[in-house]
């Protein structure tokens, strides 16, 4: 292990790398854009810097995202704010694309959980929260849409604690909701923040702060609102959890903030507090033990995402890497652990969704994209360390929907195979071939059915291949853990299907849980698992 320099250590201390998670339509992408607005990365929410119109969300770059108004892939966004270098991983909220979100959370050091004030904790929030708790990363809560009718504040806090099993500590407190929403009260400074009109939230607005005991407060909120605020704060101070930075760092206490991302209420306040409370890059688990970025001087990174055709003109493939330790320099040679050889990382880029910027240096905590000629896979480790190591793999989640896929034009077989393989390598779909049939028959597995639509759209628009999908009755897939199992001799129910994945690993498809149990009973020692590993 080489010694880390003070310069590199100081650069890493500035990094804040976090993911934003939520149920669909809770306002996650809007909050992301407001962070970019306050960080100066965009002039106006909804538009890339220099563009004139607010037509699409900055983080929604794929054509299908713009057409449907949903996020279907994680976006990587970097900007500077108040001395910090911020890497935001904006994740798709739609449940059909949750696997991309799971992988993205592996690259984050903390998470911002966005909750709709009128709905509280929703199904997708629960799923994503579980992944965060598995990694023991800090979780910060932004309760959004306070400018609309909202649940009672105490009910919202109870909902988070009861549904997710995490203690909460409100850092600020809302004054009213819906049409009566006036702003937020900061519990530490005892000041009320009143927000002015900000052109429907597209530009930064002035933040007016007034002490709760200042006579001017009566011009801004009603007597009843002030009385209700004082009563609620007294109750919260007496019965609520106190702020504890250590518990926050362990992911056991979630600081809570209230606001409205659409109108900018509470956004910059949240960003300022969050950057102070959250963590700089954390140690990562490897087969050599934890790799601490504050001690490890060698460069190391892992691939958490692969994206083809981000620029249709270039027809390229970008591997997104989370730098875990050390300093990255353009053109450096690193050892690719899974490939078993050295590779040169040339033309490194940092992203603003699909916009690219060539870089010469990056540090632990940063997310970079490098050109991938087809050698990288999700979960791969790269390092310059002499004492080589491999970071823990990224789980592959079991698909729940399956279809046989064929190209309409048999003359386009080559484009079809290339396209479906590239999309599978991104992790957007999983492809399987029936045992002993080769690539003639391809079965696609997805976590959510909307991914079939995305597959069809992308093959047609990016590879000029039209496909037909034949839905299959299978609902369960299991990886075979025993390497010694002979697939030819394995017996199961009549509706079980034997398949192999891209790496040649044997798997079994089942129509129901009874079929799984029967197959295990008929094959002594057979071990099946729901999760593969990259």
Briefly describe each language-model feature range.
Residues 1-534:
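Structural and coupling elements of P-loop NTPases
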């Amino acid at each position: 292990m080489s010694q880390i320099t003070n310069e590199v250590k100081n650069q890493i201390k500035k990094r804040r790398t976090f993911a934003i998670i939520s149920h669909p339509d809770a306002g996650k992408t809007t909050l992301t854009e407001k962070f970019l607005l306050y960080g100066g990365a965009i002039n106006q929410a909804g538009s890339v810097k220099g563009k004139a119109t607010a037509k699409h969300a900055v983080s929604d770059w794929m054509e299908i995202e713009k057409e449907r108004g949903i996020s279907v892939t994680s976006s990587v966004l970097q900007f500077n704010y108040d001395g910090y270098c911020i890497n935001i991983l904006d994740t798709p909220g739609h449940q059909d694309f949750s696997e991309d979100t799971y992988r993205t959370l592996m690259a984050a050091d903390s998470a911002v959980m966005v909750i709709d004030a009128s709905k509280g904790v929703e199904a997708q929030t629960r799923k994503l929260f579980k992944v965060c708790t598995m990694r023991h990363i800090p979780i910060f809560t932004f309760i959004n849409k306070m400018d609309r009718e909202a649940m009672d504040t105490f009910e919202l806090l109870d909902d988070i604690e009861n549904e997710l099993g995490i203690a909460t500590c409100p850092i600020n407190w809302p004054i009213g909701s819906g049409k009566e929403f006036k702003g937020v009260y900061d519990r530490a400074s005892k000041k009320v923040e009143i927000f002015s009109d900000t052109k429907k939230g597209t530009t930064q607005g002035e933040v007016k702060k007034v002490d709760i005991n200042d006579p001017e407060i009566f011009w801004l909120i009603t007597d009843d609102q002030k009385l209700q605020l004082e009563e609620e704060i007294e109750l919260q101070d007496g019965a609520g959890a106190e702020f504890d930075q250590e518990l926050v760092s362990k992911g056991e206490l979630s600081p809570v903030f209230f606001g409205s991302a659409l109108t900018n209420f509470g956004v910059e306040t949240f960003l300022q507090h969050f950057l102070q409370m959250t963590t700089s890059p954390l140690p990562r688990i490897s087969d050599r033990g934890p790799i601490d970025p504050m001690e490890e001087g060698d460069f190391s990174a892992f691939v958490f995402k692969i994206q083809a055709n981000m620029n249709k003109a270039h027809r390229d493939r970008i591997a997104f890497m989370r730098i875990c330790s050390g300093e990255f320099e353009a053109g450096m040679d690193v050892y690719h652990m899974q490939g078993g050889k050295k590779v040169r990382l040339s033309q490194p880029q940092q992203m603003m969704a699909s916009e690219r910027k060539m870089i010469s240096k990056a540090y632990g905590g940063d997310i970079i994209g490098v050109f991938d000629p087809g050698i990288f896979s999700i979960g791969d480790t790269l390092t310059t360390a002499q004492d080589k190591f491999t970071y823990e793999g990224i789980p592959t989640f079991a698909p729940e929907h399956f279809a046989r896929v064929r190209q309409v034009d048999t003359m386009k077989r080559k484009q079809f195979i290339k396209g479906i393989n590239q999309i599978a390598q991104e992790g957007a779909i999983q492809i399987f071939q029936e045992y002993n049939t080769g690539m003639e028959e391809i079965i696609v597995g997805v976590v959510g059915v909307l991914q079939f639509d995305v597959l069809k759209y992308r093959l047609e628009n990016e590879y000029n291949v039209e496909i037909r999908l034949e839905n299959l009755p299978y609902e369960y897939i299991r990886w075979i853990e025993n390497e010694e199992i002979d697939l030819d001799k394995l017996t199961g129910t009549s509706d079980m299907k034997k398949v192999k994945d891209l790496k040649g690993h044997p798997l079994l498809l089942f129509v129901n849980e009874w079929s799984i149990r029967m197959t295990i009973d008929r094959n002594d020692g057979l071990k099946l698992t729901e999760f593969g590993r990259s």
